[in-house]
Amino acid sequence: MKTFALALGGGGARGLAHIPVTEALDDLGVKPAAIAGTSIGALVGAAYAAGMRGKDIRRHVIALAHNRGEITRRLIAARAGTLADLFTGAFGQATQLDAEKFCAQFLPEAVPQDFAALQIPLTVIATDLHRRQEAVFTSGPLRPALAGSIAIPGLFRPVAIGSGILVDGGATNPLPFDQVRERAGVTIAVDVFGMPELERNDIPSVWESMFTTLQIMGSAIAAAKHKHAPADLMIRPNVTIFRMLDFYQASAILRAADAVKAEVKEKLGALLAA
């Protein structure tokens, strides 16, 4: 049987749709030879590479999503600054999140501190802000790399690793199937950007406008890459109706994405057996 590599893209809360894909792999009884992830895809990828089963990742997410008080407590603990910063001119510090603290608060305990402790090789994608290029992490401290990968400008404070200042990996490689193409015989990519919403004509909030713009940019980058050198299997869960920060709707997102399980099992199974 052929080997396969798995690429999980960014997309905020829509990225919870990666979880049913991992459950489908568990149902098939197969594991990827390598995983690459950007932003939320890096977080799910890290949990899966650490040895968690898809159903256990789902259980962790739902337990948090159904406890708003606990989410609020953890978000407060993950702030980059304090309320006092509002009155000392450091407004951004008070309103932004610290991505490393966020990972410490929300990642499952099974996710280790170092890449070396993972059961499956993992590639994490971030963006080096000042060098204006993709930053690729495959070894060393894991959680700082994950923090850099999720550091959406405006929401998170940029993350410093070595001489690099990192922001969200979606700015340079939102769906990193190219990073694992040579690692296996088959490459599967999971696109959670969503489809155009032709029936909408409402004026979105400031945050939604910004995040949707990032999604459009990411989708365009991924589409261009796929046209140039496509992944062997592209999976697109139907999660368009959800917004980037709809984490409280985790159960609904997972239900909507469950439909891809059959597609993954049928199409990937055929590719691996060919």
What are these regions (language model features)?
Residues 1-38, 46-274:
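Patatin-like phospholipase
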